[in-house]
Amino acid sequence: MRREGTMRLHRTFLLRVYLKESAVITYPASKKIYCQGKIFPTIRVGMREIQLTNGDSLTLYDTSGPYSDPNISIKSPQGLPRLREPWIKVRPRKTQLAFAKEGVITPEMEYAAIRENQKRELKKNTDQERERRLQGNSLSARIPNPITPEFIRNEIACGRAILPANINHPESEPMIIGRHFLVKVNANIGNSSLTSSVEEEVEKLIWALRWGADTVMDLSTGKKIKEIRETILRHSPVPIGTVPLYEALEKVDGDVKALTWEIFRDTLISQAEQGVDYFTIHAGVLNRFIPLTQKRVTGIVSRGGSLMAKWCLLHREENFLYTHFTEICEIMRAYDVSFSLGDGLRPGSIADANDEAQFAELKIQGELNRIAWKYGVQVMNEGPGHIPLNLIEENMTKQLAYCREAPFYTLGPLTTDIAPGYDHIGSAIGAAFIAWQGCALLCYVTPKEHLGLPNKQDVKEGLIAYKIAAHAADLAKGHPAARQRDDLLSQARFEFRWHDQFNLALDAETARLFHDETLPKESAKHAHFCSLCGPKFCAYKTSHEVRDTLQKVT
């Protein structure tokens, strides 16, 4: 079967969604700047620049897209500017993987390389002893300085990285996912049969962008699934992923037995036409693996995995996502949609971690990777789940071996089961560890995990926890663009530049709020102490006095 995708670059309908004032994203002491491409001079890569009170500045990777540019007017029905449309129109219909294998650097590849470097080449470290001492341990990863478009091309060609960019999502700003790059974070949004509207989901999308979501998955399972997805795509500068099985099941009113390959196929094509950048496909849940879950404490906890297991048992047939995998590859190749091969048998409790069912599916994922690559389709692998700290390394080691170093995309993992309401913390611990080991994309967990549908505050708290985890891993790996923010914040802290401390923080508002709870006056922003130690016991203040004394003595 050969399928030609259709580019929907001129849409004939409008969306009845109107952006609120909250759609404008602002950051304190920051401005939007753009970096120009060299291979493709028309490329303008948006970044965030923080201005410090001592005249220094910091350039940051920015996921907010046009929402943080005051010079761009976003008209709600039409959505965002179609950044990639000119590039797509003038080139052959091929995937990023196909171009990469042919040795071709695309505009998307240069764009992603510029983002990764964050203008790092303009900042030189002069303390060589400190650089040697703090040099990261990237384990088996190779992180060049600077990251070049050619390096990105080669990583994609080898299957070690993906650049998710559907031809029908020209609004997206290219980004790269792989263990040799900055660790990325995914945020899940989407309605359920009980809550949420189109407007609320768009608001959640923009809110997730504000707090640093590198990708977003629309996991809607309620009403207006297609309308919500269309609206999100037209308003998203980051790649959007879905689980097509959810919409396919909605078409048969939730009757798993009534679900067919044909219904799923048509759903897949429809979503690819809309512009979805990556699909979670649970093709590794095979008939022979289902009995392996019988003795588990929590059975099959993946929604897609449990649905496909039920379908297999009802029909006494093999998983149609597996038997029709090559046809799925052909559809995805036509639109340059990336695979996110679902971990339908991931462990949902510490008791089930690293069991036979989990790793049996992972081996099948590796086999499916090779088929996808043969068809020129980019692929990453989804992983657990609930894993104690001592078993996390085994997950990463097996994934690299079975899946030939394809990007790993994990949900956490949660390192304990005792923290309902705080699972974002318990899972961020595991996320930081597995990201250091080589995981490329972390799916955030919110405080509402296992309890309910996340609201805006939950989205923020989940993202903050996971941006901390990702950054901690980048520091440990020695990513060349990682440590500068830490150093500048530490310098500001030692020099009592309170405003700079706040503005360099991941969450400036909360940092300022906590400080002002006890010392709200503006004069306190220039004081050489905070309310924790007071003026007499501040270690930094005393340290300055020690330095001054040493200078006089020497």
From Swiss-Prot:
Q: Which reaction does it catalyse?
A: 5-amino-1-(5-phospho-beta-D-ribosyl)imidazole + S-adenosyl-L-methionine = 4-amino-2-methyl-5-(phosphooxymethyl)pyrimidine + CO + 5'-deoxyadenosine + formate + L-methionine + 3 H(+)
- Residues where [4Fe-4S] cluster binds: 530, 533, 538
Q: Which domain of life is it from?
A: Bacteria
**Where does the chain bind substrate?**
188, 217, 246, 282, 302-304, 343-346, 382, 409
Which cofactors does this protein require? Answer: [4Fe-4S] cluster
User: HAMAP family of this UniProt entry?
Assistant: ThiC
Name by which UniProt lists this protein: Phosphomethylpyrimidine synthase
